[in-house]
Structure formats: structure tokens, C-alpha cells
Amino acid sequence: MNNLLLNCDIGESFGAWRMGLDAEVMPLIDCANIACGFHAGDPGTMRRTVALAVEHGVRIGAHPGYPDLVGFGRRSLACSAQEVEDLLLYQIGALDGLCRAQGTRVRYVKPHGALYQDMMRDPAILAAVLRALAAYDRTLPLMLMSTRDNTAARALGEAHGIELWFEAFADRAYDGAGYLVSRSQPGAVHHDAETVLAQALLLARGAALRASDGSALALEAQTLCVHGDNPASLAAVRRIRDALEAA
């Protein structure tokens, strides 16, 4: 069984609004994708989430998104390549500053929501993200979605000198090309803990999933995305962690 790192989007509260069970999920994961204030999060939330990650020895990743608090970063914005670079540099730098104040640093980058999806489907946006990482710190890996064919993404990563960490999702359905089924479609998100655990174990074993079109889908992955938004999803994360450690 592959030794997949568990990553989770975290630090997504904002002001008086609370999102996720951060304190409960942090001890169960390897990598924390911390929101950087544009789609969610604020300076205080970011600083507290960094401290929580340090306490539990969890790697810290910047989780930048489009400037869209109302839409939680799930709506695409018509940004130029230069604007995408600027958005990435601003958000990575903000989180890294809060990290350095606590004796640590950002270790990787994973874009959020619509920016993540746009990056996966538009090579120009992916190239802009890679240029931002190269400009800020060429040693930072980029976490991105594993699909049926990672050849083009891998070539762009190599061209920019950026390491890629391919990820798969335990609680999402995939289409035939290996992309995530849109959240607007029925069955796009798995809510049943047994289904989430079964998919996580298939991915850890390198076995094929069943895509929404019925085809077999094999995904290359170094890390597995999980969510701890509610008690049910938290229970699924705990079961995945236990299963991976027992394997």
C-alpha cells in the first residue's frame, strides 16, 4: 500500500464565522492547506492555524484562492496571467510571514477552489502559478490534481523547475477524464463514511476507481485530500488514518 500523505483544507474561518473542525482534524493529517485570507481566513485565524500545525508537527501549505469571500473562492474570476501570479505571491507571502514569526515556514502550495480547477484545465493559468512559485521560492512544491493523464502538467512543472505533488480525493466523484465531478451534480461529493474509506483504500493500493462514465480510472498520487468540515467527515478522516497506519 502506498504511503499517502493526508492533506486537508483548514483555517477557513473568518471573523465571527466558523468553518471546519480544525482542532480535531489537525492531529490526524500530515499536511495543512491553510487559507490565506482571500477566499477564507483572516490574519488571526491564519496565525492560530499555523500555531496548531506547529503543535502537531503538520506540514504547512499555502492555500491561495481568488479574492471571493462571498463565494468561498468557488467562482472563477477573469484574471490575467499576471494577476494570477500577483494573487499567489501576495497570499503565499502573507502566510509565510506568519509562519516565520512562529519559527516555521510554508512548505508547499495548493490553490483553492475555482483557482485550482482553472489551473487544472488552463495551461496558461498553471504556468502562471508555477512562475509565482519559482519567483517566490523554487523549492516549494505545487500540489495539484492527479488526472487520467498527468503528462502535460508534469512537463510544465519540469520546465519551471517546480516539484509537483499529485493528489487524489477520498470524498469526491471523478469523471472519465479524471477530473472532479462538479459540485452542482448529484453524487459529486461522497458523504457516507464507508464510501469515503473504500475510495481512500483503493487509492492507497493504486487500484482503479470507477469514474462517473463507468470507466476504470487509475490515479497516480502522493497525497490524499480529506475534509474535516463536520463530525461525519471527521469520523471518516479518523478511519482513513487508522486504516493507513494499520496497513
Swiss-Prot record:
Keyword NAD: no
One GO molecular-function entry: 5-oxoprolinase (ATP-hydrolyzing) activity
Cysteine disulfide partners in this protein: none
Source organism, top-level taxon: Bacteria
GO biological process, any: carbohydrate metabolic process
Pfam assignment, any one: LamB_YcsF
Catalytic activity: 5-oxo-L-proline + ATP + 2 H2O = L-glutamate + ADP + phosphate + H(+)
Keywords: ATP-binding, Hydrolase, Nucleotide-binding
Keyword ATP-binding: yes
Classification via InterPro entries: Glyco_hydro/deAcase_b/a-brl (IPR011330), LamB/YcsF/PxpA-like (IPR005501)
Protein EC: 3.5.2.9
UniProt cross-references to HAMAP family, sorted A to Z: PxpA
Subunit annotation: Forms a complex composed of PxpA, PxpB and PxpC.
Function, as annotated: Catalyzes the cleavage of 5-oxoproline to form L-glutamate coupled to the hydrolysis of ATP to ADP and inorganic phosphate.
Family: Belongs to the LamB/PxpA family.
Official protein name in the record: 5-oxoprolinase subunit A 2
Organism expressing this protein natively: Pseudomonas aeruginosa (strain ATCC 15692 / DSM 22644 / CIP 104116 / JCM 14847 / LMG 12228 / 1C / PRS 101 / PAO1)
Gene name tied to this protein: pxpA2
